[in-house]
Amino acid sequence: MSPDFTISIDEFHSGFRLSESETAVLELQVAKDSDAVRARTMLAGYYFHKFGRSSSSTNKNIGASHVLWFVQNLPDTPFLKLPIYLLTADTPSDEAIQNEWQLLVASECSSTILENAAQYFKPKNPNKSISLIEQAVRLDPTNARLLELLSDLYAYVAAKELETDIYVSKSVSALEAYIYKEENTQRKITAIARLAELARESHNLPLAKQSVALGLELSQAKLESKITIDAIHSLQTTRGLIFLDEGNVSEAVKALESSKKKKKTPVFSSFGPQFALANELLK
C-alpha cells in the first residue's frame, strides 16, 4: 500500500476542518475497515490540528493511535514529514511508534522513510535525526530538499550543543549544496538569505558578503513575492550587521534603513551587541 502524495497531504489538511460529528462518522468507518486510508488520514489531520499542542487527553491518544497505524503500515506517508511528534508525545502509543521507527531504519529503507523517521526523532534525539538525513542524502544525492533539511538540522543542533561552530559550519556546507541544486528561484533566494546569516554567525564574512550580493541580485526579478520580500529584509539586515561588524556605522544605517522599508516593523530581537546597536541606530 502506498498513498498518493497529493491526496495524502490534501486529505490530511482537510481533516483540519472536520466537525466533531464528521469525525465520529470517520471513526466508525475506520472501525469497520482498518485499511480506510483516506478516512484515517483525515482523522490524523483533525487530531493533529486540534490536539497536537495540548497536554495528554483521550483525543490526543486516539490521534496518536492513528499515527502508529501509519508508521506500521505506510511509513512513507507524506504527512509524517510534518512535526507529528507534537501529537504523539506523552501518549501510550509513543513508545510503540519509536520502536517501529527503530526497526524500520535498522533495515533497508527508502530516503522517504528515513526523512519521516528523522522528523520523529528530532526533538528526542536530534543527532540521530541528523544521522538519518545524512543517510537519506547518500541514498538520494540529487534531492535538494534533503540538503535543505540537513542544513536546518545542523542549525537546530547548533542552538543546543556546546560545539556550536562545528554545527554551524556543517549547516553552511549543506545549505551551499542545496542552493547549488535548487532550481526554484524563490526558494533559492530564501536559502541564500539563510546562508548569509549562518556565514556571518560563523565569522565567515567573505561568504556572508558574497551571499548577500547574490541574493539581492537574484531578488530583482521577484519583488512581487511576499516570500522574496521577507528574504530581502533578511539580506539587508545581514548586510547592515556585517557593516557593524566592520565598524562602518554609516553604511550599516543605510542597509538597516533599507531593511526597515521592506517591513513595517523590523525585527532585531536576537541577542548580541550588534543587534542592540542596530535597534539604537534606527530609533
Give the predicted meaning of each segment.
Residues L26-R38, V67-L86, N99-T112, R138-L146, ...:
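Flexible helix-coil transition and linker loops at the boundaries of alpha-helical arrays
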Residues M42, Y46-H49, P83, N116, ...:
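"A position-specific structural signal for the A-helix of alpha-solenoid helical repeats
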Residues F12-V25, S56-S65, L87-N99, K122-I130, ...:
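Helix-turn-helix repeat elements of alpha-solenoid scaffolds
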